[in-house]
Amino acid sequence: MEIRRNEKNHAFETLIDGKKSHLDYEIQEEGGVKKILFTHTFVAPEHRGKGVAAALTEAGLKYARENGYEIVPLCSYVAAYLDRRPQD
């Protein structure tokens, strides 16, 4: 599954069988601290339960860590993912 970061739409996206799934984010900087706020995850209904949301989340977390962002999981899926995998 290919996931790309769409800077214009502030999302990590994948296209499967012509259906787009995405993890939305916002970037903020407060007091010199860079933050990435993961705000919403959407997976096309026919692709749910197949690891798409996890793959999008993993891509977003990897990007955040590689670029020195503090992670703020506003999206319930991302928050639950981090609770299940505290090392991620």
Regions found by a protein language model. Give the residues of each.
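Conserved active-site alpha-helix within GNAT-family acetyltransferase domains
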Residues: 22, 65, 73-88
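A short, internal acetyl-CoA/4′-phosphopantetheine-binding micro-motif in the GNAT/acyltransferase core
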Residues: 41-48
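Conserved acetyl-CoA-binding loop-helix of GNAT-fold acetyltransferases
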Residues: 49-62
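A conserved beta-strand-loop-helix scaffold within acyl/acetyltransferase catalytic domains
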Residues: 12, 17-34
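Active-site rim helix/loop that mediates acceptor-substrate recognition in acyltransferases
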Residues: 1-11
